Amino acid sequence: MLRVEQLSKSFGQVEAIKDITVEFAQGEFNCIVGPSGCGKTTLLKCLSGLMPPTGGRVALDGVTVTRPPKQMALVFQDYSRSLFPWMTVRQNVAFPLRNKGLAKSEITRLVEEAVEAVGLTHAIDRYPWQLSGGMQQRTSIARAIAYQPEILLMDEPFASVDAQTRANLEDLMLSIKARYGMTILFVTHDIDESVYLGDRIVVLSSSPTVVQEILTVPLPVARDQITTKEDPQFLHLRSHVFREIMAAQAG
Ligand SMILES: Nc1ncnc2c1ncn2[C@@H]1O[C@H](COP(=O)(O)OP(=O)(O)OP(=O)(O)O)[C@@H](O)[C@H]1O
């Protein structure tokens, strides 16, 4: 269980996060949305222990997070800067496993399984510059899942890919969640994406930020890019989230 307790974060005079309290249960897909600049990235940085909060705390299974916990992996928007250009897909995915004290054969197994899960087995020995943007982001996702995190933090991971690739990567995330069962915290600007992927949607207010609303997504677990997005419940929920964000923006 990941718990955020009365978290606040200021940068000098700028109060980015005012007071956030929220819990993330094991195995849940949580989408985090909110107006531009409301502090979504700041929240993820505090959650991951990369940035100390000004007040409150983040606790993972009751223990205060002060540095990136071993059980967490992160995927960022900018895949082109997160992969090592001189390493192949296989080497990039294996990189974080080097310090886990695993046998070489186990590393090979985890890497090959993760690369297969993201559909890149055919490209495992290619370098990042030989891959499309979507394939590079798949490599980042494979690197995160090979690490076998309990919690996966993703900061607008699909913002830089085209619409078709984005839809494919969304479906990839649903299959990864079903296969590995990790807790996922997924920051997105895209309201449709948040409703399509989420078990829950955490709507943040504008800065100084609090949690404005937490919605449970009542859609069936099995989702489909066409039929789910035609479902009246989907349409109702996306309008609701959109109104919430407009209201947050208006202050
Ligand atoms: N290192 C920093 N120093 C000073 N101010 C910062 C820093 N990082 C973030 N901020 C400020 O904190 C607020 C929240 O920024 P943050 O990037 O977390 O928002 P966001 O919701 O992720 O933004 P976006 O929607 O544009 O992705 C903004 O006002 C930003 O200018």
Predicted regions and their residues:
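The feature captures the beta-strand-to-loop junction immediately N-terminal to the Walker
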Residues: 33-35
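A short, proline-enriched helix->beta-strand linker immediately N-terminal to the Walker B motif
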Residues: 146-150
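Catalytic Walker B motif of ABC-type/P-loop ATPase nucleotide-binding domains
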Residues: 152-155
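Helix-to-loop junction immediately C-terminal to a conserved catalytic motif
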Residues: 48
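Conserved ABC ATPase "signature" region
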Residues: 98, 105-123, 175
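Conserved ABC ATPase signature
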Residues: 127-131, 135
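Conserved ABC transporter NBD signature motif
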Residues: 56-68
